[in-house]
A protein has these predicted regions:
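Metal- or metallocofactor-binding catalytic centers and their adjacent structured scaffolds
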Residues: 3-6, 10, 40-116
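Flexible C-terminal active-site loop/helix
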Residues: 4-18, 34, 262, 299-349
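Short, structured patches in soluble enzyme cores that scaffold and shape functional sites
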Residues: 13, 136-140, 165-168, 195
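Short Gly/Pro-enriched turn/cap motifs at secondary-structure boundaries
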Residues: 25-30
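N-terminal small/glycine-rich loop or linker at the start of catalytic domains
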Residues: 115-140
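Short, charged beta->alpha transition segments
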Residues: 119-124, 144-152
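Catalytic domains of carbohydrate-active enzymes, especially glycoside hydrolases
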Residues: 153-165
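Catalytic core of soluble alpha/beta enzymes
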Residues: 164-307, 330-342
Length: 349
């Protein structure tokens, strides 16, 4: 039996508190409950993946994700990680509805295999970059003091792109944006407005117009409309002076093809938890062939769980927008041995 065959695996559920409540148009949480998955090859090499469901995937409870990962681990025993694609495709075929679990399994498998070959995931993806800068997310808080404090803290840490959650009442969204802008204006910040499916075409355009008139530089409008509203997204993409990103509506290469054909976005936001790593490359290929730009986001992964996304970003160099800040939003976490953060800067170790 080859040294790259899967020998064992472990699954564990753990909860981590957030620095501040995470609030979007879809809900609110004060902690994240993730599932860690470790896989060990016969030669002793280990790989790690982490399943973290977002508020958009609230039906995926940790116990359900853990059960799926345990099943995937059992089916992988004795299989050769040096031939990962059949295992990965089987995981997604069986558990496409539990995407974060399938993705965590895939990440652990590819992490173990590349390590066994003396490679990092970033090197396997192409080794394009050593470092890059991420944005920072500011939740849909209604407390102006909390918003101001979070924005000021992030600015002091060096962040210059602020992703602000919107999608509630227009007045509340504008008040939040103005609070952030007032706190960081001297830095000439850029803004990403994340609607989390909570806006309409008209309200999105009014929000963008108000932000422009207030002097804000809006770089991107992320998934403002419901994920099934391709027609509305196409209209908004056509009418908006700001690039529009598809997030929740793209989980697979087929979804990306539909976005391209219906001209439903000018940017596609890839998340490893939605698509895994190999399908992320396929989605990127579709977007790049159609001259769409790419964003790479995350759920609520720890630093270790975010490692595959960091390596995907830096290894490929494909992404115009990086939203890899989940580790920075946690109250406490252990740094990953495979990358490090200095404020917005993420870099390989």
């Amino acid at each position: 039996m080859p040294a790259t065959c899967v020998r064992s695996f472990t699954v564990g559920i753990f909860e981590t508190a957030l620095k501040r409540p995470f609030v979007t148009a879809l809900g609110r949480k004060t902690s994240t409950c993730n599932v860690g998955f470790s896989l060990t090859l016969r030669d002793g090499t280990r790989g790690y993946g982490e399943a973290s469901a977002s508020l958009a995937l609230a039906h995926l409870r940790p116990r359900r994700l853990a059960r799926v990962l345990a099943g995937l681990g059992r089916r992988a025993l004795g299989r050769d990680a040096a031939c990962p694609r059949p295992l990965v495709e089987e995981a997604w075929r069986r558990h496409g509805q539990e995407g974060p679990a399938a993705a965590a399994f895939e990440c652990a498998l590819l992490d173990a295999w590349t390590r066994s070959q003396g490679l990092s995931l970033a090197a396997w993806f192409g080794g394009r970059l050593r470092d890059a800068d991420s944005d920072i997310t500011l939740s849909a808080w209604t407390d102006a003091g909390l918003t101001r404090a979070a924005a000021t803290e992030a600015a002091g840490e060096g962040f210059r792109i602020f992703k602000v959650k919107v999608g509630g009442r227009l007045e509340d969204d504008l008040a939040r944006l103005r609070t952030v802008f007032a706190a960081v204006r001297r830095l000439r910040p850029g803004f990403i407005l994340d609607g989390n499916q909570g806006l309409g075409v008209g309200s999105a355009l009014r929000l963008l117009d108000a932000a422009r008139k207030a002097g804000m530089k809006v770089l991107l409008l992320e998934q403002p409309l419901p994920k099934a509203d391709f027609r509305g997204m196409a209209e908004l993409t056509r009418r908006s002076a700001v690039p529009v990103a598809a997030d929740e509506m793209v989980h697979s290469p087929q979804d990306a093809v539909r976005v391209v054909l219906e001209r439903a976005a000018s940017v596609i936001n890839i998340k490893v938890a939605k698509s895994g790593l190999l399908r992320a490359l396929d989605i990127a290929a579709v977007a790049r062939a159609a001259d769409l730009r790419l964003m790479l986001g995350c759920m609520s992964e720890t630093s270790r769980g975010l490692m595959p996304s960091v390596h995907l970003a830096l290894g490929t160099g494909f992404f115009s927008f990086l939203d890899l800040d989940s580790d920075h939003l946690l109250a406490a976490h252990e740094p990953s041995p495979d990358w490090r953060r200095h404020g917005p800067r993420i870099e390989l170790t």
